[in-house]
């Protein structure tokens, strides 16, 4: 029963005796043992590198997915707050006053749409007179973003002051497009205009959550839904900077292309702006453009009824 163990013991004794008696054999055994140890170390370090890489990847993925989940909660929280901030009212008591939340009182705007061509002047009212009035803004935006051609260019949403562009952005993020996309809203008023688009996204994430998550973490995280980035307030970026960032829409289109080339992902983009000064912007041919209409009597009545 103990024969194999005894054989190994005798082999080791003879092996060590040879190493003592013959220096060449001793050198050879050291070289061979060193090779074996080095091989084990290489395998060990490779495994450590793999484990560290897997950990970093999982950590990055977790950070990205947590950030997107935080954004989902953020936009839902915003549209579920009352349309009037009671804390800013000067009444002695507001106990009996109940205001509807933004989600409940939201009335989708009617709009007009066109495909941009170089000879079109978007600020000219006559341009929009030739376009039909539509009422299906949620479906229209969803269809445009999925379109193979227009979906590779940013969708431009225009409107007069008070047309509801920012609320529409939050409704798109929290409700209308939630099941189709992970949504991030970039407030251009607060960004550094000279930065690249990824840097502006990083800046927005840092301002919102300060969690160290970067755009590259999100782009590399293998999400189950595509990403939609809404750049809200192109006109405010222009006004705040004092410079003409007329190529900004083209920068966003290039950003979309780069994400496909670098990360193999399709990123959809929406840009909102007041119609003022929009003719100074460089807009690519075939870009989809929406003009939000001011509230008509029908929508005002519907809004008041909800209130």
Task: List where the protein language model places each region.
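Charged, amphipathic alpha-helical linker segments immediately N-terminal to NTP-binding catalytic cores
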Residues: 74-130
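P-loop NTPase signaling cores
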Residues: 2-63, 94, 114-307
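Long, charged/polar-rich coiled-coil alpha-helical scaffolds that serve as structural arms
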Residues: 63-73
